[in-house]
């Protein structure tokens, strides 16, 4: 009986079938061979079961596909193909669909995280979130700022500080009488307070200098202030050079508001001497105090005169950093206005008065009200903007990178010179031996040991004489 009767009309040679099966079994991982094998036998009707012959002729009625649990988009390429079966017993093989965005948890960084980004942002790495990490760590740690106020008594230093930070730092202050002021010397007082605003903590330290400029003879009255600044640098240098550097408290003075009296025709000799003595140690911001005692034209003339004298005497006050070319135009205009306002003409007040139906901080006069936070009356808002809102970090950076580094370099140079000098002295002492006394022979020594000691003594004396002769010849030669 012919074996090909089972293959009616579409018989395939037996050797071809066996060769294809053998090739398929030899490499089951080759997709190309699998496709070729299926293609060779796809047209053979006898390869399918009898009920499969009518599958293509039946009308295909779409059936609802069961919903599967969601899966990420990256797993789509691993879904196995679904092979069609008869409509009587039709089955589907498919991987779960992707997880819907509403069902999966949200990233703490929002759109900056590729987990929540769109398909176009899948190549996003994520290091752009570093500013967020630094911000979170900095807010958790808090910030330090030390502000020094210097100037004569009665110029409104304490009042201005309270107005700047909306707090009362001098509630325990005791006002001295006339006799006590005569005997008063320059002192350094510290007022520390923790301020919190919108979750940001600031450890503010105010350094006051009561008694400065109040004496009849103010010669070198700036020395206690300079010594205090150097002491803070020295303490920070020691902490930085120690073993435990994790929790170093920064008490370095970051800014000094120097108050200039509105009475006179510019800077006084004491003002010039103070600023020249401290401009290499701290950021100096000149303040024209009690600006409400001057008319607007007088304020302009006073500012211009002070700026000319500062430049004439070579005083280096705090310099505002230059704006970058890509900065916003509004920021550039604001920065230019701050630079032109030096020295800041300010008014301080702790009293709240009512002006035009509003309660403001100001001073009440018979002719009207002077508002502290009115830009048309004084430069208080500009000073607060510069000191707190825009340039506080730059003041700290200049202190760390310029003033403290200068002090640190001087300390290292002094230590190096001392070490080199000590080494040279020890080396000269060892070579000359003049400072080392010749030891005496201990009693009870045997004759041989005594003889060796005396020979060494004679040798040392000859070497010393030769060294003295060489040194004498060198001096005569040079």
Swiss-Prot record:
According to the entry, every stretch annotated as the Septin-type G domain falls at 141-414
Sequence segments annotated as region (G3 motif): 208-211
From which residue to which does any coiled coil extend?
A: 446-478
Instruction: Give the matching CDD domains.
Output: CDC_Septin (cd01850)
Name the residues that bind GTP.
Answer: 151-158, 185, 290-298, 348, 363
GO: which molecular function terms? GTP binding
Q: Name one GO biological process term.
A: flagellated sperm motility
Query: GO cellular component terms?
Result: axon; cytoplasm; dendrite; perikaryon; septin complex; sperm annulus; synapse; transport vesicle
Question: Does the entry annotate any disulfide bonds, and if so which pairs?
Answer: none
Region named Disordered: 38-115, 425-448
Residues covered by region (G1 motif): 151-158
Name the segments for region: G4 motif: 289-292
What is known about its processing and modification?
Ubiquitinated by AREL1.
Q: Which residues carry this modification: Phosphothreonine?
A: 434
User: In its UniProt entry, what is this protein called?
Assistant: Septin-4
Organism of this sequence: Pongo abelii
The gene name reads SEPTIN4
């Amino acid at each position: 009986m012919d074996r090909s009767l089972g293959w009616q009309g579409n018989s395939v040679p037996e050797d071809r079938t066996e060769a294809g099966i053998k090739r398929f079994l030899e490499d089951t991982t080759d997709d190309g061979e699998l496709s070729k094998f299926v293609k060779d036998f796809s047209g053979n009707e006898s390869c399918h079961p009898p009920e499969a012959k009518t599958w293509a002729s039946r009308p295909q009625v779409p059936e609802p596909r069961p919903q599967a649990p969601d899966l990420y988009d990256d797993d789509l390429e691993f879904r196995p193909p679904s092979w069609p079966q008869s409509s009587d017993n039709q089955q589907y093989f498919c991987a779960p669909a992707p997880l819907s965005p509403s069902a999966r948890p949200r990233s703490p960084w929002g759109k900056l995280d590729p987990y929540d980004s769109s398909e176009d942002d899948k190549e996003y790495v994520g290091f752009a979130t570093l500013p967020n990490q630094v911000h979170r760590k900095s807010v958790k740690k808090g910030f330090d700022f030390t502000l020094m106020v210097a100037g004569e008594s009665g110029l409104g230093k304490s009042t201005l500080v309270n107005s700047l930070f909306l707090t009362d730092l001098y509630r325990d202050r005791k006002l001295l009488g006339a006799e006590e002021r005569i005997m008063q010397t320059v002192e350094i007082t510290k007022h520390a307070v923790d301020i919190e605003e919108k979750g940001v903590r600031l450890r503010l330290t105010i350094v006051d200098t009561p008694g400065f400029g109040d004496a009849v003879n103010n010669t070198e009255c700036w020395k206690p202030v300079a010594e205090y600044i150097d002491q803070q640098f020295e303490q920070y240098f020691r902490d930085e050079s120690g073993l435990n550097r994790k929790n170093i408290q920064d008490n370095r003075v970051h800014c000094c508001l120097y108050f200039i009296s509105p009475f006179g025709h510019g800077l006084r000799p004491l003002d010039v001497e103070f600023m020249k003595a401290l401009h290499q140690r701290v950021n100096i911001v000149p303040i024209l105090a009690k600006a409400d005692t001057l008319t607007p034209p007088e304020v302009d003339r006073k500012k211009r005169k002070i700026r000319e004298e500062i430049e004439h005497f070579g005083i280096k006050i705090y310099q505002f950093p230059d704006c970058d070319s890509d900065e916003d135009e509004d920021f550039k205009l604001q920065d230019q206005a701050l630079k032109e306002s030096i020295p800041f003409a300010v008014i301080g007040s702790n009293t709240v008065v009512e002006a035009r139906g509003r309660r403001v901080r100001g001073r009440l006069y018979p002719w009207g009200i002077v508002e502290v936070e009115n830009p048309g009356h004084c430069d208080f808002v500009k000073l607060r903007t510069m000191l707190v809102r825009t340039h506080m970090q730059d003041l700290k950076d200049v202190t760390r990178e310029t003033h403290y580094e200068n002090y640190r370099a001087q300390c290292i140079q002094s230590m190096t010179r001392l070490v080199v000098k000590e080494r040279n002295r020890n080396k000269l002492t060892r070579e000359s031996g003049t400072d080392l006394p010749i030891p005496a022979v201990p009693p009870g020594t045997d004759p041989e040991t005594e003889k060796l000691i005396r020979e060494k003594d004679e040798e040392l004396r000859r070497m010393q004489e030769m060294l003295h002769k060489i040194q004498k010849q060198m001096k005569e030669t040079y």
